[in-house]
Amino acid sequence: FAITIQPVSLAAGYPDSYVTNDILWYKENDSTTCSGSSSNGVSGSDNQEKIWGYLRNAGLSAEQTAGVMANIQAESGFSPTRHEVGQGWGSGGWGLAQWTFGRRTLIANKIPSELKKYYSQEYGGAPNDKGMVDSIPVEDNDKLLIFELEYLVQEGKERPVTASGFGTASNSWELLKTLKTVDDATVFWHDDFEKSAMTKDDVKNIRGTAAQKIYERFNGTGGSGGGCSSSN
């Protein structure tokens, strides 16, 4: 299958309302085309293994991948349709990274038509231990993973670095790729991309512990994933 999303990158003069809604990347008339399939885009016995393989294939080290995945685990339990607990439909976070406010609106508007039906509270509950929702076919689960992971990577490449103490780079994704340890990758991705209310100590203790377990499980394995091309 083929997925077309329309990412936007930071540009001077973008609407003030985007800032207040946490939309930090915007580029008018830009488009990104991504393609993949459940057979060669992601592979594995559970969503954890599939996400690991995709992110490794996207160019992250094992340490960086573990850091991103620990944040995904804390946010959504690896479910691409997770809806934030305690929030009415349309409010709070949604998806692997729990995109919220204007960021949620942007990704929701780009969900491929064949997958739109899963953007529903019906599928927003807690996943099973494989990170999957039992009522979603594996093929569609994998398509959702590919779509959201492609979106996450592209957003990271277009998003300016806002977290302090990790150095400088042209965007969040490039800075992430400079980090050498699991702890640094975990804290940076939280502070720069997720931006939850957790303190830095809690991030290290809770998400950092999860990241280390992910690293120990998957280190030494590679991945397979689709790709994106951007035009403007």
Give the ranges of each region predicted by the language model:
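Sec-dependent signal peptide cleavage junction
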Residues: A2-W25
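Peptidoglycan-targeting cell-wall enzymes and recognition modules
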Residues: Y18-K50, N57, S76-T181
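Solvent-exposed, polar/charged alpha-helical surfaces in well-ordered, non-transmembrane soluble domains
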Residues: E49-G53, N57, A66-M69, E150, ...
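Hydrophobic/aromatic-lined pockets within catalytic cores
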Residues: R56, L60, Q73-G77, K157, ...
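Short, functionally critical alpha-helical segments immediately adjacent to catalytic or ligand/cofactor-binding
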Residues: A62-S79, H190
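Active-site or metal-binding loop neighborhoods of secreted/extracellular toxin and effector enzymes
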Residues: N171-G223, C228
